[in-house]
């Protein structure tokens, strides 16, 4: 690298105010074109830009209704799946901060991350991961809510 640094040519990059704004602008333009795919019972199924944008808006609205404000932190711990991207975009679209957490974390790891990040809500997939995140959240006083991506998830009873 030379002593003088050239300014990067930004003409080829998206220069929107933020990622969420760029997403919604693209969703309006690309509407019914496919965006996210996943395997369901051995078959690939997809969601188009409009469907994903609707899911992002609905989750963002639920977060706001739960009292989340800009700069609040939301933990996301889930496998690589369309709902992860939807949760990520929903959190960013309301100005909150995503706190990503590994699916391999122990309950104690999740407690540490929740306590030190100040996360108020956790979003997770289902099954054992949801149980582990729920147990961790039950140990963190400031945690308000747990949202699961899988609607039929059974969580531990905290009485």
What label would you give each PLM region?
Residues 1-18:
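Flexible, non-catalytic linker and terminal segments flanking ANL/adenylate-forming cores
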Residues 13, 77, 123-126:
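Active-site-adjacent beta-strand anchor residues
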Residues 14-35:
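A short N-terminal helical cap/helix-turn-helix that marks the beginning
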Residues 23, 87, 133:
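Aromatic/hydrophobic pocket-lining residues that form π-stacking "cages" and hydrophobic walls in ligand
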Residues 35-89, 106-111, 159:
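Conserved AMP-binding/adenylate-forming core of the ANL superfamily
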Residues 65-66, 93-159:
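Structural core segment of the AMP-binding/adenylate-forming
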């Amino acid at each position: 690298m030379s002593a003088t640094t050239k300014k990067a040519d930004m003409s080829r990059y998206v220069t929107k105010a933020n990622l969420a704004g760029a997403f919604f602008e693209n969703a309006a333009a690309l509407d019914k074109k496919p965006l996210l795919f996943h395997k369901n019972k051995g078959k690939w199924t997809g969601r188009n830009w409009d469907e994903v944008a609707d899911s992002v808006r609905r989750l963002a609205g639920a977060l706001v209704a739960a009292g989340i404000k800009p700069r609040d932190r939301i933990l996301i711990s889930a496998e690589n799946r369309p709902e992860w991207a939807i949760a990520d975009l929903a959190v960013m679209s309301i100005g909150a901060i995503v706190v990503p957490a590994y699916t391999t974390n122990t309950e104690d790891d999740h407690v540490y991350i929740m306590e030190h990040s100040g996360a108020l809500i956790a979003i997770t997939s289902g099954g054992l991961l949801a149980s582990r995140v729920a147990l961790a959240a039950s140990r963190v006083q400031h945690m308000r809510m747990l949202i699961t991506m899988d609607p039929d998830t059974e969580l531990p009873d905290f009485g």
